[in-house]
A protein has these predicted regions:
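N-terminal targeting or regulatory segments adjacent to alpha/beta-hydrolase or S9 domains
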Residues: 1-45
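Catalytic nucleophile loop
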Residues: 170-171
Length: 171
């Protein structure tokens, strides 16, 4: 470990760079889809880590925070229900970024509401989130929690018309 301090510093700077890129990309969502969609980002709570790094710490067993993007067509009417698409991003250590803007635009044009979780292990939130990956386990719970959040908190979501789409790690 003594011979590896440069590696640790490099890893920290990579995560810091990812966080900066995420903040820039968050602004770009408004540029890419803001003309047709209301864009929001919420913090949700998922199950505790699958394995605590320090099981005796005060935070051991606490719920894990993650973020989710919400895209709602600007054309929605309050007295109508709309279908929901749950869209987990692909890539084990990736994130929901504007790479997907063309897909979000198409879904919004068809009057779908979209929720897209940046589940545990996603990039752009620092080493803590990145290292919480469960490789197909608890990330699924995070995605399901984002679905439930939409159904429980948005009266315009039709709970009988909920779909999921994705590919690779998100599919």
């Amino acid at each position: 470990l003594c011979s590896m301090p440069g590696v640790v510093r490099a890893q920290l700077s990579v995560h810091q760079f990812d966080q900066l890129m995420k903040k820039i990309d968050d602004v770009l969502w408004y540029e890419k889809v803001g003309d047709i969609a209301h864009v929001d980002k919420v913090i949700l709570c998922g199950p505790p880590r699958w394995k605590e790094f320090n099981p005796t710490s005060m935070s051991a067993g606490n719920e894990l925070k993650f973020r989710a993007y919400i895209f709602i067509p600007k054309s929605v009417k309050e007295n109508k229900k709309y279908p929901l698409i749950v869209f987990p991003h692909s890539g084990v250590h990736a994130d929901m970024d504007t790479y997907y803007a063309h897909i979000i635009r198409e879904l919004i044009a068809q009057e779908y509401i979209v929720v897209a979780a940046d589940y545990r292990g996603s990039t752009g939130y620092g080493a803590g989130t990145y290292n919480n990956i469960d490789y197909g386990g608890l990330e699924n719970e995070d995605v399901y929690i984002s679905r439930n959040y939409m159904v429980d908190n948005f009266d315009i979501v039709d709970s009988s018309r909920v779909g999921i789409m994705g590919w690779s790690h998100g599919g």
